[in-house]
């Protein structure tokens, strides 16, 4: 895809140029339209993985104050280049500008969303104190899992068949193409690097399956990214969820949003957000619940056996995503350690690589 090298060139030039514009000044300009004149900005805490993020208190001229969550480009050049090449920040901004108000799931209130081709700023409500934000190493409770499965079914029913090329949602399909293009070059070396870092955390048989998956990415992609498509979150682990009253979920971090198969979200969530024993005992119940809810919400009536096979195949992607996350340092190590343990157990239990029928 020609836009990938063009994006890399633009971002590389911007990194070399640098920025002398303080975050406080940018926040004042960004929030003027939605909140009014900003008198002072107090930063609370900050961190950086795929993007740089901070919590801040904004003091307004009217005397009110508002706590916000701000996302800006990563301060690590290699991470920023990879994230922009994948179109992730542009996708999240586009989601909040075009879809956030219409999806049937809870998302943070957006106060500002802008991407200019090289830099971006996203300002969201700060959920601290209003919703529970689990640590990424935690596992969902049974009640939380049921609520997330219901919400995913509602989201997928809403988005079923919506992403179409040449239409307003065509960018969601373009993200599939971009992921496939980058995977051609990066999937195998990143898988090797991630497995090297994981060491004995990934059993040899599972590591061999992961490498076979990476070498045969074209065959795997045809099975995992083909039609029918719906709108998927595409990164639904517990670190990207918050829970409100009665454990109703709120979905965070939409930078991976795209068109895709329903099983991508369901298998990813069950694989990475559930304790392996809970997943083993509850995944069939969750799958049946998902199918019934999807159909009741206006989606298709999925065949039970075909749904189970799709779920098995997509668990392999959850493992691949975790290995790649480890390779590029896109999450804290304690989080990737927890996800690796869950993902290796899932692909082993479900015989996921065999379900993909990949050549040796």
Where would I find each of the regions flagged by the language model?
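Short, glycine/acidic-rich hinge or "gate" loops at secondary-structure transitions
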Residues: 113-114, 162-176, 301-308
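Conserved NTP-binding catalytic cores of kinases and kinase-like/nucleotidyltransferase enzymes
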Residues: 1-119, 244-249, 359-360
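Active-site catalytic-loop/activation-segment of kinase and kinase-like phosphoryl-transfer enzymes
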Residues: 3-5, 9-14, 167-220, 323, ...
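Regulatory N- and C-terminal appendages and interdomain linkers associated
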Residues: 1-47, 59-65, 160-166, 208, ...
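Conserved kinase catalytic-core helix
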Residues: 133-171
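Active-site activation/catalytic loop segments of kinase-like enzymes and analogous catalytic loops
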Residues: 94, 256, 263-298, 315-336
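Conserved structural core of kinase catalytic domains
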Residues: 112-147
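Active-site acidic catalytic loop and adjacent metal/ATP-binding pocket
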Residues: 47-60, 69, 215-262
């Amino acid at each position: 895809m020609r836009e990938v090298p063009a994006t890399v060139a633009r971002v590389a030039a911007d990194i070399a140029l640098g920025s002398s514009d303080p975050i406080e000044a940018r926040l004042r300009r960004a929030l003027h339209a939605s909140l009014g004149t900003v008198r002072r900005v107090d930063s609370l805490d900050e961190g950086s993985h795929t993007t740089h993020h901070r919590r801040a208190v904004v003091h307004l001229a009217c005397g009110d104050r508002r706590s916000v969550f701000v996302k800006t480009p990563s301060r690590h050049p290699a991470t920023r280049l990879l994230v922009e090449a994948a179109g992730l920040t542009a996708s999240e901004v586009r989601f909040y500008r075009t879809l956030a108000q219409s999806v049937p799931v809870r998302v943070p209130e957006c106060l500002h969303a802008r991407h200019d081709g090289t830099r971006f700023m996203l300002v969201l409500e700060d959920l601290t104190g209003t919703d529970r934000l689990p640590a990424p190493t935690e596992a969902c409770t049974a009640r939380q899992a049921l609520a997330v499965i219901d919400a995913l079914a509602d989201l997928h029913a809403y988005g079923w068949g919506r992403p179409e090329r040449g239409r307003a949602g065509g960018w969601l399909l373009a993200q599939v193409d971009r992921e496939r293009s980058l995977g051609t070059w990066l999937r195998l070396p990143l898988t090797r690097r991630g497995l090297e870092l994981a060491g004995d955390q990934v059993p040899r048989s599972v590591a061999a399956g992961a490498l076979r998956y990476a070498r045969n990415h074209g065959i795997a992609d045809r099975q995992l990214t083909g039609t029918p498509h719906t709108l998927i979150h595409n990164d639904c682990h517990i670190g990207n969820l918050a829970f409100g009253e009665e454990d109703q979920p709120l979905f965070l971090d939409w930078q991976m949003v795209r068109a895709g198969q329903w099983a991508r979200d369901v298998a990813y969530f069950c694989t990475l957000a559930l304790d392996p024993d809970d997943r083993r005992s509850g995944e069939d119940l969750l799958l049946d619940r998902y199918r019934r809810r999807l159909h009741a919400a206006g989606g298709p009536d999925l065949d039970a056996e075909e749904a189970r096979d799709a779920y098995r195949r997509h668990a392999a992607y959850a493992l691949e995503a975790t290995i790649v996350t480890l390779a590029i340092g896109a999450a804290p190590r304690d989080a990737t350690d927890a996800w690796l343990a869950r993902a290796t157990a899932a692909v082993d239990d479900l015989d996921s690589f065999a379900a993909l029928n990949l050549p040796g």
